[in-house]
Regions:
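Sec-dependent N-terminal signal peptides of Gram-positive bacterial secreted proteins and lipoproteins
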Residues: 1-15
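Secretory pathway export signals and precursors
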Residues: 4-7, 51, 243
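Generic detector of intrinsically disordered, low-complexity, polar/charged segments
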Residues: 7-9, 48, 73, 137, ...
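Domain-terminus/edge residues, biased toward the C-terminal soluble/receptor-binding domains
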Residues: 11-15, 188-189, 202-205, 209-210, ...
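Active-site-adjacent loops and short helices of periplasmic peptidoglycan-processing enzymes
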Residues: 16-209, 218-219
């Protein structure tokens, strides 16, 4: 039996953001970004080329009458084996991603960076509010890209995100341009990114469907899947004076940490959380169902952390094709 719905106040609102007028059109998107020529109409009515291995939806809500969908702004469940969208709530609606942004940051870093390269943390990267999500890095610290990626995904460090962006591209603005370029290449055309950490900006937004596109590309990388499924990581690095520093970073994912239990038949691999006042509580989760099908499930703008996991368990129980043990 699933737990009861929580009455929540505080971070996040349950109402959805403004939806985009048009749903995602694979043919038009492929033409716009020159994946096919403007004259090529042979594939106009098919999902070959751009979306042949993707879950595709017409944008109509699906399954929401059997869930407590009012606790979140948007959600979706995607079966990567059957290529089906099994649950859809406002999946093309404009949402603020908070730290789920770091999925794309990691994807770009893994594509363009070298895991063994060592970066020095700048004053800009270290200058993060202590009450925000940080790895407690100091100006002048030396860490490898691989280490910074653990801090980015597990600890959700905003400082690690800036250090990665500056290490890859020289500055945050140039890295954000690269993020937008890669997002569009993946078909995530209803998104725009301003920074690598997801701190709120009116012009920093995405959709559930775009996050699915980005995340499904990221999980093809073995290093990324290693990052999202790690519960605890001990990092050793040097500070600006050459002295050894050790920290222990913990995952922010309650399923991994054992403080939340998924429904029977579901095996949680990992994922990424995100929270800001404007974004609410967000979770992108990678799991398998009892048939072994890989599942991506996403919730954005939940009204509190308890309802985020309550709603996620509803989605896993009812729409990942599993039964509770």
């Amino acid at each position: 039996m699933l737990p009861f719905l929580f009455l929540c106040t505080g971070c996040g609102q349950s109402s959805s953001e403004i939806s985009f007028t048009d749903t995602y059109d694979i043919y038009e998107t492929s033409k716009k970004y020159e994946i096919i020529s403007a004259e090529d109409t042979s594939l106009q009515n098919t999902t070959d080329f751009f979306g042949k291995d993707l879950c595709v939806s017409d944008g109509i809500d699906l399954g929401t009458d059997s869930t407590d969908s009012q606790v979140a702004g948007a959600a979706g469940v995607f079966n990567l084996n059957t290529k089906e969208v099994t649950y859809a709530q406002n999946i093309y609606g404009k949402m603020y991603p908070a730290s789920t942004t770091k999925i794309l940051t990691a994807y770009v870093a893994l594509k363009y960076g070298n895991l063994d390269d060592v970066y020095q943390v700048s004053a800009n990267a270290a200058d993060q509010a202590e009450d925000s999500s940080v790895c407690h890095l100091k100006e002048g610290d030396y860490l490898s890209l691989h280490q910074l990626l653990y801090g980015l995904i597990m600890q959700s460090g905003n400082d690690a995100a800036i250090a990665i962006a500056e290490g890859i591209s020289g500055d945050v603005e140039t890295f954000a341009e690269l993020m937008n370029q890669e997002a569009k290449a993946l078909g995530a055309v209803d998104s725009h990114f301003i920074n690598p950490n997801g701190l709120h900006d009116e012009n920093h937004y995405t959709t559930v469907y775009d996050l699915y596109l980005i995340f499904q590309a990221a999980v093809q990388n073995e290093t990324f899947t290693e990052l999202i499924q790690t519960k605890e990581y001990t990092v050793d690095y040097l500070d600006s004076a050459g002295m050894s520093v050790q920290q222990v970073w913990m995952s922010t994912n309650k399923y991994l940490m054992g403080t939340e239990k998924a429904p029977g038949g579901v095996t949680v691999i990992g994922g990424k959380t995100g929270t800001t006042n404007d974004a609410g509580y967000c979770l992108v989760l990678y799991s398998t169902n009892q048939e072994g099908d890989p599942i991506i499930s996403i919730i954005m703008k939940a009204d509190c952390r308890n309802n985020l996991y309550y709603y996620m368990n509803q989605l896993l129980y009812g729409f990942a094709n599993v039964t509770e043990n």
